[in-house]
Amino acid sequence: KQGYESLKKIADLKGKKMKTLGMKNVEKFLNKIVKHKLQNSLMIWGAPGIGKSSIVQAIAEKNNLTLIDLRISQLAPTDLRGIPVPSDDSASWLPPDFLPTSGKGILFLDEINMAPPAVQGIAQQLILDRRVGSYKVPDGWFIWSAGNRKEDFAAVFDMPAPLANRFIHLEVKTSLDEFKYYALHNNIDDRIISYLNFRPKHLHKIDKNSPSWPSPRSWDIANSLLSAG
């Protein structure tokens, strides 16, 4: 009964906005989705540079799933739908080779709300129906998405209501404690952690007037520069 109630709570989240969660809790939630093989589509919201894509990659690696990472904002509608191939009296659509045809994995539609409406429309078919034209997503695949929010000064489009209502929405936040945990397990330079202990607000601080600003991703880049000497 307890397992049933847990699954029911997850199912009831579809189309609703969850409260903001930390990285660890989001990771636990995604692992539960995979464990119970729930094919509900997910939308991960969060500021740029906090590690949304990294969470999905970690889930794929932990569960031995293939990850196909599609930057939807860089695709045209025909890139997802494929191209028509004529025959004697009709034409069929040849799907793109980057879409999965077998196995198990995560089809990750990143930057989905940065894509123009025409592309979101094709993606909507993929998410709602798990198919586009004659192409069908294999049963062993999860379809997850991610995107930035308008308040992050991101160049995003409004998400169509039918598409938004299909998702389980997860809003991700970052914290210094979680970044320090990540740093401990990924050989992040002690000087970075010492500085962030002194200036915790500099872990993630968007500056709309500057192209460079601190984020967990930029601190990771800084660490690679420090490692190089």
Language model: regions and residue ranges:
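Conserved AAA+ ATPase small/helical "lid" subdomain
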Residues: 182-229
